């Protein structure tokens, strides 16, 4: 059953100003740590490989370690937030980030550094699902409708930090060496902890005991889910030479996880809820597909710029920077939209147009024209990110919004993993014009399918704002 709780009476804030700067600042800072760490490492890999005499494949584990851990930890942290209280889990994540910052500064080997990245993945994964739970409960307590602008700010923070992560990593590495990429997490985490204590109210409910808490956390479900993700990822990463036994293990784990979830009173992955809540399940699929295209552009186009036209990494970053900046701005603009359906239709049409533009580029295309041709990719990124986030907010059951938000991020990382596999399959050893054009046509087909599926999905609400604010759930945080 649920976790036994003791309820304390707290002062309910007014609806006006409920999502102001003080309330949003720690949530935004925490939510930025995962995306910035996922990209900041990219410009430090060469220096790390040189210091530890490691190969490209070995240093690649620093990237994969964070992605795999985050894909598993996001829904896990969301589940814990639903059980323990969002503020507690948010703070616990920041403590782990601070610890990782210290450990990374003094890591003696590459293996130790990989474990530091795993620790970073766990710690940074706490912020987003707990932030969604905190926003949901704040709206319930104040009688506010869905905080679309606040959701837009969270999306903007995530997208903007992805854009500046590589540049920030390069600056830090240049100033103090690659260890600065890890050290910087310590002051950021400490600042976040301070802001949480100052501006985020304490959780309203308190767990009565660890034994009853353990009964509410499906450990076996988490282990099976982790195994499913790992084996599925290893299969996708070997698409050039498919590892069929790995696929068989993944399918078997999926079957066992499904049976376990259906037989468990409080499953980690609520298969029954996902099966009955088709709109939420479709949102996960749609978000994974849009992120597949986003990561294809983030990694594929950047690699092609350096291999095809032969630009330096700095110039390649400058060419893609306007696209990333537009994505962040469009996420903020999406926060002002009340609809979910219309922005998603517009966004998927934008992906279709943007993918068509990529078909036109060649190695001889001028840099200024390349900026203009890839710029359209920024607009649908922000709009679709915000709209899908808002969809989860209104589609997920109130008592499971933390877990649901974590699964949304998991679908994002699955999209990233599939994108990496697709790029390896299409690019081979070196990105070429032909490989880039093939990738563009794949994205044209995928975005066209998304347009059709989105237009046909009548479950998407035209109006995102609920008629009545949800009531606070027992055990919710403020």
Protein language model regions, located:
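Intrinsic disorder in cytosolic terminal tails and internal cytosolic loops
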Residues: 1-19, 207-211, 456-478
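12-transmembrane solute porter fold
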Residues: 19-36, 41-45, 56, 60-65, ...
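Membrane-helix boundary and inter-helical linker elements of multi-pass secondary transporters
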Residues: 50-52, 57, 82-83, 105-108, ...
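Interfacial loop-to-helix junctions that mark the boundaries of transmembrane helices
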Residues: 57-58, 111-119, 177-184, 236-249, ...
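Small-residue hotspots
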Residues: 93, 100, 116, 123, ...
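Hydrophobic transmembrane-helix bundles of small-molecule transporters
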Residues: 152, 160, 174-286, 293
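Glycine/proline-centered helix-kink
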Residues: 158-170, 229, 298-299, 416-424
